[in-house]
Design a protein with these regions (language model features):
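Carbohydrate-active enzyme catalytic cores, enriched for enzymes
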Residues: 1-128, 182-185
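CBM-like, beta-strand-rich accessory domains located in the C-terminal region of large
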Residues: 11-58, 133-134, 138-319
Length: 319
């Protein structure tokens, strides 16, 4: 479900497992998917990892079945609410979009307030990331941050979460997301979705987001529509992988560099941009790459104030 690297991180993950047969610690989700393909005798994409796990190795001896990598294509997973936009013509670009439920059952214990967020990988390198989980009980303030809307690549209204956080594993007034349209082609495709989490405000706010991957022109367009009647503070958040270098070029343009990629982000002219580097004094600018393991990274806040319906476009281009 993504070209190169681990399976994208969404919601909680604590690196837990029941039995270790002595192999290296690899992505458990990728391992489980690979195992399911063996049992179901599906010859498909080997997900997430290049190395074969010990579990796969032994199962393959008995099942006489091997998994081979194949070219990814854009795909919809409507039951979960995840949608993959994949360019198959030139650059390997994977964009995973989230418009699924907040979480399981009415408490959504392991859910994060990340409706309409997305993660981006180009040529096997993570560019825009989900921050991960980091902690469950030891550091409640960090637990709250990593679950929050501001910690994800989506829009925050009036510094409030999309859903109402009632505890470390408890949510109330769940934001409901819905896919409005889904179109794909060999260059990527386009998805439009909305969520109703901010309709609970005294002046209800509806957030609709369209994301289009145009691989032929090496461009991603993100269009955020905010429907309201009174004044609101709008923050678009973007979080970059810790291996990326992020710099402001001018008042509305960012340059992101990784080992193999040079990427430009063009934000709305009317927005105020603030880059935050992770430190002991801020929650923003942190990425959890394992349970109880966090590293400093760069986060962007793109801030605007509106008092009527508004639309904002962000462009992501690479070379």
């Amino acid at each position: 479900i993504a070209e190169g690297g681990d399976i994208p991180q969404f919601c909680d993950g604590d690196d837990g497992y029941v039995l270790n047969l002595g192999g290296p610690k690899l992505n458990r989700k990728a391992e489980l998917i690979a195992m399911s393909q063996i049992f179901e005798d599906k010859k498909g994409e080997k997900p997430g990892q290049e190395e074969i796990t010990e579990v796969e190795f032994w199962l393959n001896q008995f099942c006489n079945h091997s998994l081979k990598s194949s070219m990814l294509e854009s795909a919809a997973f409507p039951d979960s609410g995840y949608y993959l936009l994949q360019n198959t013509n030139s650059y390997n670009v994977s964009l995973m979009f989230d418009c699924g439920p907040l979480g399981y059952t009415n408490i959504a214990a392991h859910g994060h307030a990340d409706a309409l967020s997305f993660v981006l990988r180009i040529e096997g390198e993570n560019i825009l990331i989900d921050p991960g989980t980091y902690d469950y009980f030891t550091y409640p303030e960090w637990r709250s941050y990593f679950k929050s809307t501001q910690a994800h690549n989506t829009v925050e209204i009036d510094e409030l979460d999309q859903s109402v956080m009632k505890g470390l594993f408890l949510w109330d007034q769940h934001a409901e997301s819905s896919c409005d349209s889904w179109e794909v082609d060999s260059n990527g495709g386009k998805i439009t979705a909305h969520h109703d989490g901010y309709l609970r405000l005294s002046d209800p706010v509806l957030h609709t987001r369209t994301v289009e991957l145009d691989g032929a022109n090496s461009t991603i367009s993100v269009i955020d529509n905010i429907d309201c009647k009174k004044e609101h503070r709008v923050k678009m958040h973007y979080h970059y992988d810790h291996q990326c270098q992020v710099n402001l070029v001018d008042s509305h343009t960012l340059e992101i560099r990784s080992k193999r990629n040079a990427i430009t982000m063009i934000l709305p002219d009317e927005a105020k941009l603030t880059l935050t580097e992770g430190s002991d004094k801020t929650f923003l600018g942190h990425q959890s790459i394992g349970y109880h393991h966090k590293v400093a990274t760069t986060s962007l806040i793109c801030e605007l104030v509106i008092n009527q319906p508004a639309s904002f476009t962000t462009k992501i281009q690479w070379r």
